[in-house]
Every structure is written in structure tokens, then in C-alpha cells.
Amino acid sequence: MNLEAFVLGSGGMMPLPNRHLTSVLLRREGDLFLFDCGEGTQVSLRRLNLRWKKISVIFVSHTHADHVTGLPGLLMLSSQVDRDDPLYIIGPPRIAEYIETSRRVLDMYI
């Protein structure tokens, strides 16, 4: 089994030009798993040429801003394209409220 880890962001509070907020992607035999989704996650995915459409699960450790502020943008992008498989989000109970509020405020169709 081949497992690769990509640190997409490791900063806190405020993203810097070369250091985005918390996010790690694991790739295992073509499957992609995202752990946290801080601001700048989409930029890092693009810079590393990682196929964000292949992310099958997003795990959210907790709902501090530096771990979730990239989620609305990634979900909005995901809602605009055809996905081969569903996207699952696993996290603490309040993550559902955060996603629903973001969906409503940003008028997302997810």
C-alpha cells in the first residue's frame, strides 16, 4: 500500500503568502482524504496539481476558523462540477451547522 501525505497548510490565524491555514491531504492508491480545510486549501491543491474532485472524505477535527474557512469555497467549487462519487464530511456536531449556514448565506447548491 502506497500512502502519501501533503501538508497543504500549517499556519494559524492568518494565512501568509507561502503558508496557508491548516490542511493535510492523504493519497492512498488514488483515493484522496482531506484533513481540515483552512483558508488557502484550494490554492495549495492547485499548486501541487492534486485533483480536488477525487477527494472522497473531508475530516474536520474541530470548528476553529483556521481549520474550516476554506470549506465553503471548496464545497462551492465542488457543487459546480460533476463528481464521480459523493463527497462525505466527517466532523464534530457543529460542522453541520457551519456548512448549513454557509450554504444558506452564500446561496450554495450542495
Name what the model sees in each region.
Residues 1-110:
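Binuclear metal-dependent hydrolase catalytic cores
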